[in-house]
Amino acid sequence: MAPPTLITANCCCETEVKYFKYCSTSLFVLILFNSWITVDLVAEKPLVDETYLFEYPTFFLVNATDGGALKGTDANPAMVDLFNEDTNFWNLEALSLFVETSKLADGIMMQTYFSLQISLSFAFSGICVKYITGLKNNIQKCS
């Protein structure tokens, strides 16, 4: 059965239920608001006015929306290095390191997750698509 699409603005609460029901085996999940897709389709889509939600299981919950403003509970101080407010771009090197160091020991899945919502109209460039493509092995389509 295909997973439901993300149709409301309440990403934190709604997505958590869907994530653990449909994607608990995925290390890194990419979700388009109106469909669930693979990274190959991301590279093919125009990088204008598209909004994606990235989820990663970790020890805290952070929402980054509206140009990268960080909000959440028990946020890791290291998150401040992930977004450059002067340029409105994500620090891909820091994000990559963060994802790598956030993997859970012994495969234990915590009940919170790291969610990063980005508007591609300002945040994504060609290099970012390459970065996501490089994570292909860790991105799975929910089915």
UniProtKB/Swiss-Prot annotation:
Protein's membrane topology: Multi-pass membrane protein
Subcellular location: Membrane
Entry's transmembrane regions: 20-39, 113-135
Keywords on record: Membrane, Transmembrane, Transmembrane helix
Cellular component, GO annotation: membrane
Further details from the record: Partially overlaps ARG5,6.
This protein's name: Putative uncharacterized membrane protein YER068C-A
